[in-house]
Amino acid sequence: MKVISNNDLEIHKLPGLLHKTLSNKHNGGQEFEVWKQIIEGQSSTPVHKHDCDETIVVLRGEGECLCDDRRFQFSADQTLIFPANSVHQIINTGQEELEILATLSMSPVIVKTQDGERIPLPWDADKSLGE
């Protein structure tokens, strides 16, 4: 059992996006990862896929997601469930920030382009809380 202060976790800044890894293999989450992300208004994640399921809880904001060439609208208090290897993207269609909590069913998570090329993530080597 471990209690972590989310305020002590490193924030990774990407264009249009703030990322914080709440749980992963480096701090006790052996079989899954939990990410908190804030996507700026009119910004998005890259189109990507991974070899695991992903469940996203929308905490605030609204937007749309693309999943395997289909488009879905969503807003706060909704949950998005992506099967493993589905090509997807989260888009903030509003002006306000979109805040999401993502749980991914593997650790570490390997993120790939839709063509299967690995996307290096700045938090891949995040061991700030030690093992």
Feature roles, as predicted:
Residues 53-54, 58-63:
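Glycine- and acidic-residue-biased ligand/ion/polar-headgroup-sensing regions
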Residues 34-36, 81, 96-111:
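A short hydrophobic beta-strand segment most commonly corresponding to one strand
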Residues 1-31, 115-131:
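A short, N-terminal "cap"/entry segment at the start of jelly-roll beta-barrel domains
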Residues 47, 65-66, 82, 88-95, ...:
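Short beta-strand His + acidic residue motifs that chelate non-heme Fe in jelly-roll/DSBH
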Residues 19-20, 35-50:
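Conserved short histidine dyad/triad with adjacent acidic residue
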Residues 70-84:
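Short acidic-glycine-tyrosine-enriched beta hairpin
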Residues 51-52, 70, 86-87, 96, ...:
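A generic "binding-loop/recognition-motif" signal
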